[in-house]
């Protein structure tokens, strides 16, 4: 799939459809991932679902991230499906070239960076070089 086709697929008004579209794209592109989930809360009634690509190298690496949620009621093409598409392409390229990297796609950015805060709370910083 190309970036423009990914973008059309990811630009969804409904948050559940957007999340499913991201899942579809990661599977179609053969990128292994894990799901980091946080239960729903008063601040974020949907809970958090971060998608973390499985590192292809045990070496310390750079971390690339983007949020996949969008302002409620919008398609989120600029904010932030475009960045997600670019990072998926970058992940494929770096993996093919055996360049160590980590990728995270965060939920809950529009609700106060909830997904990235949740991710950082359990991050092993020794696995990163920057």
Model-found features: residue ranges?
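A non-catalytic alpha/beta surface segment that caps or lines the substrate-entry region
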Residues: 2-56
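Active-site beta-strand-loop-beta-strand hairpin of nuclease catalytic cores
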Residues: 58-63
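Histidine-centered divalent metal-coordination motifs
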Residues: 67
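Acidic/histidine-rich catalytic neighborhood of metal-dependent amide-processing enzymes
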Residues: 71-130
